[in-house]
Curated annotation (Swiss-Prot):
Keywords: ATP-binding, Cell cycle, Cell division, Cell shape, Cell wall biogenesis/degradation, Cytoplasm, Ligase, Nucleotide-binding, Peptidoglycan synthesis. Cell wall formation. Catalyzes the addition of glutamate to the nucleotide precursor UDP-N-acetylmuramoyl-L-alanine (UMA). Belongs to the MurCDEF family. Pfam families: Mur_ligase_M. It comes from Anaplasma marginale (strain St. Maries). Transmembrane segments: none annotated. It comes from the Bacteria. One of its GO terms (cellular component) is cytoplasm. It is found in: Cytoplasm. Pathway: Cell wall biogenesis; peptidoglycan biosynthesis. InterPro entries: Folylpolyglutamate_synth_CS, Mur-like_cat_sf, Mur_ligase_C_dom_sf, Mur_ligase_cen, MurD. The gene is murD. This is UDP-N-acetylmuramoylalanine--D-glutamate ligase. The keyword Magnesium does not apply. Its EC number is 6.3.2.9.
Amino acid sequence: MGETGISTVCSLVQSGARVLAWDDDKCVLRKNRELCAGCEFVHPYEYRWDEISELVLSPGVPHSRCNESWVVKLAKRAGCHITSDVEIFCRSRPARLIGVTGTNGKSTTVELIGWILNRAGIDSETGGNIGKGVLSLPQGKAAYILELSSYQLELMRGVNLDVGVILNITPNHLDVYSNMADYIAAKGRILEFSNLLVANCGDSNTAHLCENVGNMVEFSCGKKLARGVSVLDGRIYFQGRVAEIGGLKIDSASNAENIAASYAVAKSLGVSDEVIMASIREFPGLRHRNQVVAEVANVTFVNDSKATTAASVAKALVSRENVYWIAGGKSKDGGIEPILSLYANRIRKAFLVGEAADMFAVSLQRARVEHVMCYDVYNAVQIAFAEAIASGTKATVLLSPACSSLDQWKNFEERGDAFCAAVAELVAPHKLCSTTTQ
């Protein structure tokens, strides 16, 4: 029962519902008793299930056939409807609803769409799996843009999205799903709820999933489409129009899919090209997503802590050379070999941390990429910076772990903050020296 669970409980209590809640973690339970006034904390084994109308699951509680939580089994045995905060939100908000899913880029796309719509005069709010519990979002907005995970999509029933977006589908969460086909099917549930679908035809899994969809706007970052949105070589192409996307605050290469999808959604809602392009240029991006945090001499530091899969790391590497790459953590299925087959020549050296360090070392050795065991982010930053600055060439120290953070950190934000703190400690003397010289 994290932030989403707390916001769900508080919202339902305020609406007048009788709410029962539970968390297996005793420390969390103790804290939440103080935060959630009006809620009864009762173990599910003591529920009178015939009196319960719905079981609302927090994100991450396993509920798929191959990996089912004990409480889900109890609810199913009692014939109780199992739902999520997102479904409750969607059926209670009379506003435009835009849902965004995919393996990589969801949060940035959600925030970019919201950024564009607000600048177009469409009062909008973002939420969902991005870290803002949807039931705590302010009411009365003209549009809500929601990040939807595969878990949330599986629990949704009878939802009506004005626009649904699929950015990409690459291997992820295969510790939860029995195979890739099940993961794709979970993502594909957004098709059932979308009046208009915006989909990446350049991604093979997404293209196959959407091949029989009627009302759809396609986008591609690999070829120019006769119909749909294309982002190529720093330009957006749509219905015979061409717009330059230079001078962005975010990296255009790694954010090409996010830009294309956001453009398509905004156009579908009637936003002008002028407003869209001006908004994209001013969008500041999100923390922990290919975020430039400092530049010292010839070295740029980039915090990409959110990159927990090989496919997301590839987006950071595609626009950079001479990379001193900090990688590792709690490994996911797929490893890093797909990255190395394409981008090994961009990596000057890898600095390995966390549980996956030994496994990654084997892959790097096969690809003939130099690497060193650092075990934690602080040491990795220190060593990588020393080697990068000694190289005398323009270089990037990149935290892009290709792993989850749960071996050493509470979440990817905490890991990214640790990287930024280590960088700040290094950068401070150089800034002082630079100021003194001037």
